Each structure stands twice: as C-alpha cells, then as structure tokens.
C-alpha cells in the first residue's frame, strides 16, 4: 500500500522535487527542479528512525573493497550547476565525485547507483543547495588571509599573481621569476585552497617568459603597469602556445604603446583572456569593451563594477588611485584615474553579462575587488537584471533556470575552461574533485553552510566548541578538520604548467599538495564559454559620450540604490 504526502510536507521532509521551486536568498530568482533522481518512498535519509541504518539503507555486508561503496553520501541535494538544476544524492570516494543519482543499499532498495556501507559518512542536504566550488581567476596575492576570505563565499580555487604587499603585486597579478614562483608555491602549500600562479608577461624575447613557465607558473599575465606592449603581448602568446598555458591581459589604459586596434592585432587570432573587460579596472580607454565581441577573446569582469549601483563610480576612483600607486597631488595621475571610470560602460557591463557576452566573473582581489564577494556579486547582478530586463527567453514564473545556469557558469565552469583546469574542477560532474559548496537557500550567494575540499569538510558554519551541541552561538564560519595537517595536502590542488609537471616540480621544490598540469588552453574560443558564448557582431563605444552600442543599439541600465544579499545578511 502506498502512502501519500502533500507537496509541502514532502518538501519539508525530503527537499523539493520536480514541480517545486527554490528561492535563492532574498533575490527574486527561483530555481525549479528539472529532474529528481531519488525514488519516492525510498529516499536515503539519515537520522534516528530513518532510512540510513544498518541493513536498511546501509548495506550490512559490502566493504570498501567494493568500488561502488562511497566514503561520503550527500543526500537529497538540490544541485545548481551549468549542467542542470536537479535533485539527487551525491557519492564521493577518494576525494572525487563518483556518482550523482541514488545512493543506498542494493539489497533492500531498487536501482541504486552507488552503495552506502559501514565506511560511508552522511551529509544531509535535503532542502539545501549544492554548487561547485567557485574559481576566481584574478587574485592579487597580497594578503595570506585571502583563501579564508574566499572560502567565506564559496571560492575554493585562486588563480593570480603576487608576492605579498609589494607595490608590484598591489598593482599587477604577476608572480615574477623563478625565485618568487618557487617561494609562493611553497608558501601556499599548507593553505586549504587550490592555487595557480601567473608569470609576468613582458619582454622582447620569449626566453624571459619561458623560464617562468618552466619554474611552475600555470599561466601568463601581461599588465600595463609593467608594460602592455605589442612585443610583450606577442612574445607572451608565443610562449603560451608553446607550453599550453593561459594568457591574460590588462591592456594599455593610456594608449601609450598603441590603441585597442593595435592590441587586437597583436593577438593575431590567438586565445586571450581579457581582465575587467569593461575598463574601470584598466584597459584601453574608452573602448576595451569591444573585445567582448571577438571570437578568440574570453572576456571577464571584476566584481567592483557589478552590479551597477549609485555608489559604484565614487568608490572606483579612490580604488584606482590607491591600487596603481598614483598621487592625488599630480594632475596627470588624477586624469589617469578619471579616464578609466565611465558610468556608461559600467552600466552596459551589467547588460552584456545578462546577454552572455561577458563570460566570467572574477574579483581583482585586494586591487580593486573583493575575493569574498565573487559569488555574491554574481547573484546580485542576476537579480538586478531580472528586475530591469525581465525573464530570459525560456524562463517563466518561479523558473529562472536559464538565467541561474548562465550566472553560476561565470564563476565555476567557464574560469575552469579558460585556465585549463576543467578536467579536474569547475562543475558538479562525475570524475571531478569534490570541491563542493552547500548552502541554505535563505543564505544562498551570501554565506555557505559547508565547504568541502577534495571530499573533506574544510570550512563551514560552526557554533561554540565549548557547548553541548554544534548549534549554540556564536555560529560563524570557521576552519574545519580539512583545513589542518596533512589533510590539506591530500584535498587541495596546485596547478602548474605541463612542462613543470613533467620535469618533477613537485619533488624539486618539495611540495606536498596534489600537483596537476593545466591543459587545453590554446584552442579555445568564445564558443567554449558555457551558456555565455554570445559574441555581438559589433560593439561600439562613442569616444565623446562613452555610450555603448551593440549592433547599433544603445545598451545601458540604471544604477540601483540597494541590492539583494546585502545588509540583510551583514552588519557592515
């Protein structure tokens, strides 16, 4: 005899199912369940008197020698990923996702995809949301506290450059030369996050960049503060092509070495990742945004300009002055800062993101951006665009899935593809490392509940350890066991060039983390950017008014006074 439950009661017990929608934080975005892999009446739920007990949902006989037995089951999760919005159990074994479907005991349950045994831990995610760990491709390694602040917003992978608060690192995302690359690789070896380092892309000879890739850099960054010249870009791209590493550029704001067209010519159709493609973070003034329409360019934004608010412009001017070592007493320095900040291009940037013309969201951490706000700003922007532009094509009432999948891709899979690490991380898919973020729907985008790194709980909301339960206040984000000891080395990744990997960089400099090579970075086009592959035929910026036109139509939006995911969640 079957037992019937009404939809509301079912959702309270087992989480939403097909036909239900979940509101994301205090935004007006609703994620609708597209498919439910669990079986009604046979859900694998943990707890006293529930299913995951010996001989019921837990196999009484299967040992870990059976590869179908997982180390961890995340039960009844609502998964939000570029691949879809689904309800499923997630099986994790040896630090990787091995199954997404239905977990339990095959002796008592039908159609089980993976086995829960005596060796299996359970994380109850009924009513919770699971996303892939976020990836920030634009981090200035200035403070050693950056990984912790990133984890606060579900960012588990950092790419960038720097050596600490040196002026070169304050301004540019480059870790220059073998000495600094080696020492920084060693410095982050005990930090609970994945890391990659960008070499300094300058010089009229390829050898000056090549030696940095051999030393373990996982990509190349050309920055105007070190000189973004035609020769420097061309030679850096030659090295990138030779060693299969990503190439990123912060172009010439002052147009000293050439204009936007000259830089575009220096690319020669080769794959390029353009930082802060709007321009306030730097780049050809006023028309760097033209790059967002080129097939060989993978364009990203930095989060201080997203979403466009009434306070954005004033904040940006101050940030430019501090970040780029400018003197407010020197008129030319002030003019330099003012040339980079244009409300018209900031307004257009929001719309280009919503159209899928800007593919990636990053932070520019500590150098005009905030590492702990990458995911949050993404969802604030998505919410703003829904309010100002309405539903995307295919979306409907209580179903914003197309927009949600577009925006989650901006800080998960697309940065992974761009920097050659998508085989390892960047999505909730079988075979990838279990870098996962678990959210309560009411806190989604603002504050994670738990962060897993390589299948181990590493960071999360935790109460007073001196109390009788884990729930008493103060409940704040704290390091968990995965952030300590040898566990850090077994659950976190360091990315290097294939050359450095093949030549034993891990052993040479004594790294303990899992070291992996980046790959497949050089034949990418805009079409490889998941759900964010729109390349307008023409993007034109009026040199006098700075108005932005896409295919001859003005693109703009209004600033907002308040955002979602803001003061309702934070004291300051």
Curated annotation (Swiss-Prot):
Instruction: List residues binding Ni(2+) 2.
Output: 221, 250, 276
Q: How is the cofactor bound?
A: Binds 2 nickel ions per subunit.
Pathway the protein contributes to: Nitrogen metabolism; urea degradation; CO(2) and NH(3) from urea (urease route): step 1/1
A GO molecular function term, named singly, is: nickel cation binding
Annotated Urease domain residues: 133-572
Locations listed in the record: Cytoplasm
EC primary class? hydrolase
Q: Which residues carry this modification: N6-carboxylysine?
A: 221
Q: Which domain of life is it from?
A: Bacteria
Q: How does activity depend on temperature?
A: Optimum temperature is 60 degrees Celsius.
Q: Which cysteines are joined by disulfide bonds?
A: none
Catalyses: urea + 2 H2O + H(+) = hydrogencarbonate + 2 NH4(+)
Gene Ontology cellular-component terms listed: cytoplasm
The cofactors required by this protein are: Ni cation
Induction remarks? By low pH and excess glucose.
Q: Quote the catalytic residue positions.
A: 324 (proton donor)
Residues noted as binding Ni(2+) 1 in the record, renumbered to the chain: 138, 140, 221, 364
Subunit note = Heterotrimer of UreA (gamma), UreB (beta) and UreC (alpha) subunits. Three heterotrimers associate to form the active enzyme.
Q: Which family does it belong to?
A: Belongs to the metallo-dependent hydrolases superfamily. Urease alpha subunit family.
Entry-linked PANTHER family: UREASE
* Purpose: Ureolysis may allow urea to be employed as a nitrogen source for growth and produces ammonia which may protect from killing at low pH.
- The protein, known as: Urease subunit alpha
Q: Which organism is it from?
A: Streptococcus salivarius (strain 57.I)
């Amino acid at each position: 005899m079957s037992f019937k439950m009404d939809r509301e009661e079912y959702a309270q017990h087992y989480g939403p199912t097909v036909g239900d929608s979940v509101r994301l934080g205090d935004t007006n975005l609703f994620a609708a369940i597209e498919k439910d892999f669990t079986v009604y009446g046979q859900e694998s739920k943990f707890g006293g008197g529930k299913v995951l007990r010996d001989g019921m949902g837990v196999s009484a006989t299967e040992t870990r020698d059976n590869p179908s037995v997982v180390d961890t089951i995340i039960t009844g999760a609502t998964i939000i990923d570029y691949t879809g919005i689904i309800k499923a159990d997630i099986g994790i074994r040896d630090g990787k996702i091995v199954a997404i479907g239905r977990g339990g005991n095959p002796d008592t349950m039908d159609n089980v995809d993976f086995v829960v045994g005596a060796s299996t831990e359970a994380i109850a995610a009924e009513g919770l949301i699971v996303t892939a760990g976020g990836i920030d491709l634009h981090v200035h390694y200035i403070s050693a506290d950056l990984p912790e602040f990133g984890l606060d917003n579900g960012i588990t992978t950092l790419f960038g450059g720097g050596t600490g608060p040196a002026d070169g690192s304050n301004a540019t995302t480059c870790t220059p030369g073998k000495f600094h690359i080696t020492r920084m690789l060693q410095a982050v070896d005990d930090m609970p996050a994945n890391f990659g380092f960008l070499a300094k892309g300058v010089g009229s000879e390829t050898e000056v960049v090549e030696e940095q890739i051999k030393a373990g850099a996982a990509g190349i960054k050309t920055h105007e503060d070190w000189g973004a010249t035609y020769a420097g870009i061309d030679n850096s791209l030659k090295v990138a092509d030779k060693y299969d590493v990503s190439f990123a550029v912060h172009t010439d704001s002052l147009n000293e070495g050439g204009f936007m067209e000259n830089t575009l010519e220096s690319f020669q159709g080769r794959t390029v990742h353009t930082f802060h493609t709007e321009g306030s973070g730097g780049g050809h003034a006023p028309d760097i945004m033209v790059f967002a329409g080129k097939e060989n360019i993978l364009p990203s934004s930095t989060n201080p300009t997203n979403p466009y608010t009434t306070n954005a412009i004033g904040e940006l001017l101050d940030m430019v002055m501090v970040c780029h070592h400018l003197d407010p007493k020197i008129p030319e320095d002030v003019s330099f800062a003012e040339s980079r900040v244009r409300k018209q291009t900031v307004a257009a940037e929001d719309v280009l993101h919503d159209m899928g013309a800007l593919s990636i969201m990053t932070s520019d951490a500590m150098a005009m951006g905030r590492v702990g706000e990458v995911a949050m700003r993404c969802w604030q922007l998505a919410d703003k665009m829904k309010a100002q532009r309405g539903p995307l094509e295919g979306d409907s009432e209580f179903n914003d899935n197309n927009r949600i999948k577009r925006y989650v891709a901006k800080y998960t899979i697309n940065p992974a593809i761009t920097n050659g690490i998508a085989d390892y991380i960047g999505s909730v898919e079988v075979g990838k490392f279990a870098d996962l973020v678990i959210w309560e729907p009411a806190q989604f985008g603002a504050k994670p509940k738990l962060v897993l790194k390589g299948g181990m709980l590493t960071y999360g909301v935790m109460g007073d350890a001196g109390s009788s339960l884990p729930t008493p206040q103060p409940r704040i984000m704290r390091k968990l066991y995965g952030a300590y000891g040898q566990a850090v080395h077994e659950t976190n990744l360091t990315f290097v060039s294939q050359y450095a990997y093949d030549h034993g960089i891990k052993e040479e400099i004594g790294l303990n983390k899992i070291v992996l090579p980046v790959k497949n970075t050089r034949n990418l086009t805009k079409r490889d950017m998941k759900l964010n592959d729109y390349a307008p035929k023409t993007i034109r910026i009026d040199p006098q008014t700075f108005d932005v036109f896409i295919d001859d139509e003005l693109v703009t939006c209004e600033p907002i006074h308040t955002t979602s995911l803001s003061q309702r969640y934070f004291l300051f």
